[in-house]
């Protein structure tokens, strides 16, 4: 949604405000998912043996910035949080992202959360055992600006997320993956995906659903439950970008019910559930 983001900023909505709203939506969905997992664990197997660990994996762009906000908010809400920056810290150059990164560093120094920087696969693999303890994994690695084959250390992060989810399920332990905007890496315009690709249980995107998920059944499967969250973008920011069909973005977090079959020509304009399609936040 890069063009819409830029238009919203020209109207006076700051990048920091957009990122804060997106991170708040991710936090709300994460807390709901943790509640669901806790209820599941309270069945015959008994309650969770220890407080659930939330692992937030962040890439270097705006998508990662949304993850930084979510990590901060989850830690502030009293959750056990491990935040891993899967990039060189020097790439945190955007003003909003850099601000949130600085706040997280201060929180980590105070013991409010665990924070790691893993710009190489080798450093990321040192966290393998800790990541494997996660009850909820938040994928904030890449946004819509990514293209081509996955590069390291992102590819290793994708493998770790999928392995953690698979092994937890095999052991009967509650574990879910929450994707920010889209699982890494699904093309939000056409629905194609990288190899490897994260398989999520729930995806939260922002402002409007993305056409790629209406176009591709496999993309929908990989996304899991697909939620659209408002982040305060005015309709005026869409002028000349999203066709005006009279449909409004949701006023609260809303799950999309995809309509089958979806014609490609229609889906290029509408992303199911009456929500027009639009590009996602950049990586």
Question: Where do the protein language model's features map onto the residues?
Answer:
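An N-terminal, well-structured beta->alpha segment
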Residues: 1-53, 259, 267-270, 280-283
